UniProtKB/Swiss-Prot annotation:
Keywords: Cell cycle, Cell division, Centromere, Chromosome, Kinetochore, Meiosis, Mitosis, Nucleus. It is found in: Nucleus; Chromosome, Centromere; Chromosome, Centromere, Kinetochore. Component of the NMS super complex which consists of mis12, mis13, mis14, ndc80, nnf1, nuf2, sos7, spc7, spc24 and spc25. Interacts with mis12. InterPro entries: Mis14/Nsl1. Acts as a component of the NMS (Ndc80-MIND-Spc7) super complex which has a role in kinetochore function during late meiotic prophase and throughout the mitotic cell cycle. Required for correct chromosome segregation where it has a role in the formation and/or maintenance of specialized chromatin at the centromere. The keyword Protease does not apply. GO terms for cellular component: condensed chromosome, centromeric region; cytosol; inner kinetochore; kinetochore; MIS12/MIND type complex; nucleus. Its main location: nucleus. The keyword Cell cycle applies. This is Kinetochore protein mis14. One of its GO terms (biological process) is mitotic sister chromatid segregation.
Length: 210
């Protein structure tokens, strides 16, 4: 694989603003000027030019400026400014202001919300398994209570009939139920009616939950 091919897959240098780009360029320019001052001092140049900067130093400065501009023109293809290509951002600075800088706190909050959604999905999946079984058990228990109550009522009725046969003069009533038995019967019937009405709706709601 060629080196050019390797370079094509490298990530671009990401800068947040045009000011960052200008700062990097100014640092690069300053470093070159420092090298120029070492190798072609301005004072020596003016002494050679009789008080004026000699032509050699002037030409070297021009070439170095061309080098700086050429270098940063080339690297613009590998630089982004606030998510935009450097060329586009530098030509129209408004482009680089359309996207907000990365917000770590906002990303953390989004991750927390995502985790809460995941937890909710797990909870719903758990309810899909447990809630129908709980309703079914409550329904079965209510039916068993009702059946046991009716069986007791039947036994009491038979017992009262036997007493009437054995003691016809004793006042007994096979048509009057004890108040607590009636209340218990009504409560059981209410439970069964509630479960019968709400169980299909609860199951359907859980099945529709994503």
């Amino acid at each position: 694989m060629s080196s050019h091919g390797d370079a094509s897959v490298l990530p671009k240098i990401a800068l947040e603003s045009i000011n960052d780009y200008s700062y990097v360029k100014s640092v690069f320019r300053q470093a070159i000027q420092e090298k120029l001052a070492i190798h072609l001092p301005e004072q020596a140049s003016r002494e050679a030019g009789m008080g004026r900067e000699d032509q050699l130093r002037i030409r070297v400065k021009e070439m170095l400026n061309e080098l700086i501009e050429s270098t940063f023109s080339i690297i613009q293809e590998n630089v982004t400014i606030n998510g935009f290509d450097a060329n586009s951002a530098l030509q129209d600075p408004k482009n680089s202001d359309q996207i907000e800088p990365f917000d770590l706190a906002l990303r953390t909050r989004v991750q927390q919300l995502f985790n809460e959604v995941e937890d909710a999905h797990v909870l719903v999946a758990r309810y899909r398994k447990s809630v129908p079984a709980q309703y079914e058990k409550a329904y079965v228990d209510a039916m068993e209570q009702q059946t046991a109550f009716l069986r007791n009522v039947k036994d009491d009725y038979v017992s009262l009939q036997d007493k009437e046969v054995e003691n016809p003069d004793e006042q007994t009533s096979t048509t009057v139920f004890r108040k607590e038995d009636i209340d218990r019967y009504e409560q059981t019937i209410a439970k069964v009616a509630y479960l019968k009405k709400n169980l299909p709706r609860v199951v359907a709601r859980l099945e529709k939950t994503p």
